[in-house]
Amino acid sequence: MLIPKEVKSAISQLRKNNFEAYIVGGCVRDLLRGAAAQDKALGEPRPAEAGREPEDWDLTTNAKPEQISKIFPRSFIDNKFGTVTVLTNSKNPKLKEIEITPYRIDEKYTDKRHPDSVKWAKNIKEDLARRDFTINAMALDIKSEIRSLKPETNSKFQTLNSKFILIDPFDGQRDLRNKIIRAVGKPEKRFSEDALRMMRAVRFATIFGFEVEKMTREAIKKNAPWIQAISKERIRDELIKIIMADRAADGIELLRKLGLLRYILPELEEGYKISQNKHHIYDCYEHSILSLKYAAKRNFNKYVKVAALLHDIAKPRVKRGEGLDATFYGHEILGAKMTAQILNRLKFPKKEIEKISKLVRYHLFYYNVDEVSESSVRRLVRQVGPENMDELLQVRMADRIGSGVPKAEPYKLRHLRYVTERVSQDPISVKMLKTTGNDVMKILKTKPGPKVGQILDVLLGIVLSDPKKNKREFLEKEIKKLGKLPEKELKDLAQESRKGREKLETKRDGMTKKKYWVT
């Protein structure tokens, strides 16, 4: 993998001014993961969990913020920790900005969120010691151009014609190879500095498919209540990253096992061990997790995934009775209200709250091919919003698989898709014309009657054959011509036009049926 020229240039500039400079943190982790996967695959396509190009590039140096700014005139200091954002001329969005942070040591964390103050560290190892996990506490010292990384030793890596040194005082490379999430130093101290790190441990384990090391796990279990000190916005952002991961269901379950879920989504944990009825083989919590698992497998969007996780959130509160005949009447109505409350608590945007709540509210819609009319489908589309119908059906699919049924989209759901598209299509009618019955009467100086409708029918037939002719000027000329035709001839033309329209409607309906494999 090539180190981008923008990154190498920034390192070079710092070194020319007699400062140290290293690539650091998550981008080193991603570089090593990508190289390891590539080396293992021997040129074959890399697996989904393989490393990827870093989302951003972070550098660290022994230069102070003012010194960095002097070296890079197109830069600004953007926080109290001395991070300097350097602007580049790169066309790559990921490289338009490069963050350079001085070596630092974080002082006491009173609020378990941010250091009360920072002081500059003497060397790179002191800086790495303040970081969260060993896999993020590595730095890369570029000695010359790097073409690929091959992590097979502890300190040096050889490439075809260049070399570099990995600064790895906490054995992050070993943990990376062994797929371990381990806190740097004492886990409890790391989490007391920033309690959100407990969620980050879950997020990294979820995204990478890693295990959380025992001492790190125990520290999270012991100190899970600390997460309450974190702002809801930061919790929301971490939660969404977990939900959007391929292994989202595993991530939510890990939050529960580590004792974090009760402080993040206590309503979801209420469903743990709450049995359902004859229509379900899983308890309320398991059903929600499995619904999310299917949504993740199908790569549905964020709204569907959140709705899949929360769609039965109210079941524990409305449950009546036990065993096979237990009921959950109204859970979709209360569930929509609870979903709105949860998302509002987590500071989701208002539009997202409305959309996801609506998906929860209507996820239980009733549809049987021979029992539900088109007017009922129109009403559902109107209530949910045509823009949300696909997502509602996806939530229903996730709900079905989460219930243990073998088929996500049975015939009746495909048929509903067909009817939904059919009722949402613009009808083929004279309303499509760029003229009206009033125009016909005005041009021909006539009164309302069959002749007006016949002329509009003929005009529609002309426009359906050639949509470009649906222009007011052309239609006015045609109205004058048609107005001169004998009554019978005009009547026959109108009838022929209506037959053509019916054929077109039948053809369109047939294509829609074929699209959804229904009859």
For the regions a language model picked out, list residue spans one by one.
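Catalytic cores of the polymerase beta-like nucleotidyltransferase superfamily
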Residues: 1-519
